[in-house]
Amino acid sequence: MEPIPLEAEKPGSCPEPFGGSLMNRGSFLFVESNTTGTGELLMKRARLLGFETYLVTRNPARYPFLRDSVAQLIEAETRSPDELVGVATKLSGLAGIYSSSDYFVEAASSAAMAMGLPAANARAIATCRNKWKQATELQRHSIPIPETWLATSIRDVENILAHGTLPVVVKPVSGSGSSGVRLCDSAAAAIAGFNSAKSVLQDQVDLPSPDILIQQYVEGKEYSAEIIAYDGKLHCLGILAKHKGPPPCFVEVGHDFPAPLLEPSLQELASFASGAVSALGLEFGPAHVEFVITESGPVIIEVNPRLAGGMIPVMLSHALGTSILDMVIRLYAGEGFTPPRGSARAGAIRFRLAPTSGKLKSLGFSRNPDPTVPEAGLLKSEGGDVQIKGDFRDRVAYAVGVADELDAAAAAADRMIDSLVIDIETAADESDKQDPGPGEGRWALHPEAMKLLAPPIEISRDGRLLQHQAAIDEAHLVMLADQGLVSQAAAADLLKHILDLQDEGFQSLEGRDAPRGVYLAYEAELAARAGPEKAGWLHLARSRNDLNATISLLVLREAACSISQQIGIAQGALLQRVEEASSLVAPLYSQYQIALPGSPGHYLLGVFFALGRERQRLHSLLEDIRNCPMGAGAGGGTSMPIDPLKTASLLGFEEPSFNSLDAVASRDHHLHGLSIFASISTLLSRVAQDLQVWTTREFALIDVPRNLAGGSSMLPQKKNPFLLEHIKGSASTVIGAYVSAATATCKAPFSNSIEVSNYGCSPLRLSEEALQRALILTSLIVKGMSFNVRSMRDHLEDGSSMTAIAAERMASRGIPFREAHTQIGEIAQRLSQDDCATQRRSELASQLAGVFPVSLEECRDALQFGGGPGKRSTDDQLSVAKTHFREMELKCAEISERWAHAEAHCKGRVKELIDKHRSTCRSGVCG
């Protein structure tokens, strides 16, 4: 069936029944606008209401609809309220100033206030627009929000993730329309999201976004509340249920009104959302409140000081029977506000997202709308380019359904949007028609072999590798351009497409077949976007061999740093507990036998120092990863006059590899790293073994809280500290990963090989995940466990643990230690086990008068030499531990800062090349 293009239903069309008048009511100034959705429609409605309509913008090219717009165009700097006031004073009979764009509502409000026109408080809008300030203000008013952090550097991101729990949401502090918002389930994804979020607003509206928000991801169904503030009251137009596209993006693909909840719940949610609006000081105009309903109640995600986007007002207008857009225009024109009557109808809106990037060959609906679909429209034009951005710009069409029941309205919208026919021609489609060249195209892997060895790309699995691949490409292209081996025009074009791929989270590669590996699939996508001629320069003077070797070191570097940070968190938890636990008395064991009086603090310090050595080994490993393999090619270098030192420094290495064969053949850093991981997991397993034994009734030295334990499916009395078993079990995975990698490597030739580059390196991810899990669980247990003080003392009550001190005191009085040891041993053997512990201790004190310690504390504190648990010794150990901890934290921060500086320098060089090329093109000398 041929698609029906619905030419008349352009985006932003609105049915006429909502009223209108062409009488002259003065002028109305729009400051910038939504580029899709209701932006154009607001201007049309203002004109129909009788206003002379003006649009002031700093960049008319942002608005394709201006060709047919009813608005008169004014060019000015719209980020400056003073310039806006200058524009406004020249308009006769100005009734109102309004902006439908998140980015300009503050400036528009400031200008309106200066002109004495209706407006929201500009300071309140500024607080809302800065989502970090918004979060702080909502917290101050005890309104539930996700745990929120501010990040201005990669180091900030790493520190946040070290103390937070994945997944997290990364987004610009002042963004809109889901632009730059990403769900991140790994540190690599969060860092990539951070980098992408910093540049996304520059690309959209030429606004920098140096500050990035990181929020704990909140699980639950998402909703929004549409609120109008007027005359001291907050009016909720409705609660809507939200539908989102696939993660990691947050593109909204549908809304249902009213949300399918009971009426009391809807009223409570309206009150909840209004509370957030009130807390932020928004006393005039529309507010769009987004929230999630969790098991413990609703949580505010963000409050936007403007009318909802995404055609929500159009759908609400049809459902409520009155134009929300007219309502807002009249409000800002000073004509007041009358709340709409209660809805007798339900509404739903559905969007279709572009499935891929490319040229839009055809787009249209294959069915006519029925009476339950009052509006459907296209958001893209045939012949135009579509680029997947992971935000509102990915939408290509919408359909509104309205009916008496929500199910019927949703079904109508679904039917209409499902009838959309879309045909996008990707550059890859064109390249597929070409005959394969003499390179990789000659090789077609057998389908069975491909199924086993080359599964389709999964971003959740391969995204980390792709991020490193893109970073290497950036450094390599900058070097090639600087050396004059590739034209700056070709390098800049390729770099722009690489940035696009990064911004999109490589989503265009999701599900892509990769018969010869992820890299060649990635390169094919670049060729599809930039053209095979330009993309063909990317692989100059390099091979997959030096690429893979470099990626493996970047992955190892990242993993080792991440584990080091987790060790730091565990050490911090240990030090916290040492402070409170050093004054307690507890058994010190030797082969599960009570040996001496010690303290929990002494034990925890022992674990701290052992972890500290492991962390130092990791730091030494990171310092050793100094040579970058790039430039080694397939193992024999290259004849091209490259600058490997420049590539190395841009990637955070200190120098290139000295020997090309060593560069591609060696994976000793991996084996070393895996061996350190194995050693750490062994230590954690031993600690977990102790703690598990100490939770038993027979020992009863510690207890773990209920939220770190489990019950039994059969035994009602059982409290199972099963997390400790996970820590012990993780060791088998980590140790196994080392054995697997060493076994894969030991019989491989000293050159590039699949055994080394694949099987020798792939266990790292499994090892890192298992060790991360063990470290996090260890930190939780250490923080949460409690000490059973009475039980600890009871185990020492019989005095036997004090006899070693008595023997040493006898030796200090001239009796040979072996003789004293024998005498006390004989006394201890004669004690009756039938007597109670107190009687046995009393008997020992009687027979060893003068040398037997008076108390357990005296005995423990006597052990002050050789790093014992005595108070003076423990205080000294704690002081040393704190110093070591601070020094290592600084060392780790320095090395992370070095990498971040290299990355920022590389990104700066990339931007410099791209900007220079753009400038050249504008001058008409584009190559």
Curated annotation (Swiss-Prot):
Keyword field: Amino-acid biosynthesis, Arginine biosynthesis, Cytoplasm, Lyase, Plasmid
Which EC number applies? Answer: 4.3.2.1
Q: In which pathway does it act?
A: Amino-acid biosynthesis; L-arginine biosynthesis; L-arginine from L-ornithine and carbamoyl phosphate: step 3/3
Q: What would be an example GO MF term here? A: ATP binding
EC main class here is lyase
Query: What are the ATP-grasp domain coordinates in residue numbering?
Result: 135-333
User: Which Pfam families has this protein been placed in?
Assistant: ATP-grasp_4, Lyase_1
Cellular component (GO) terms are:
cytosol
Cellular localization per UniProt: Cytoplasm
Q: Which SUPFAM superfamilies match?
A: Glutathione synthetase ATP-binding domain-like, L-aspartase-like
Which example biological process does GO assign this protein?
arginine biosynthetic process via ornithine
Catalysis performed (reactions): 2-(N(omega)-L-arginino)succinate = fumarate + L-arginine
Region called Argininosuccinate lyase, residue ranges: 431-927
Among InterPro entries, the record links this protein to:
Argininosuccinate_lyase, ATP-grasp, CbamoylP_synth_lsu-like_ATP-bd, Fumarase/histidase_N, Fumarate_lyase_fam, Fumarate_lyase_N, L-Aspartase-like
| Cystine crosslinks | none
Known NCBIfam families for this protein?
PRK02186.1 (NF002563)
Return the similarity comment: In the C-terminal section; belongs to the lyase 1 family. Argininosuccinate lyase subfamily.
**Name of the protein in question:** Argininosuccinate lyase 2
**Organism name:** Mesorhizobium japonicum (strain LMG 29417 / CECT 9101 / MAFF 303099)
Q: Which gene encodes it?
A: argH2
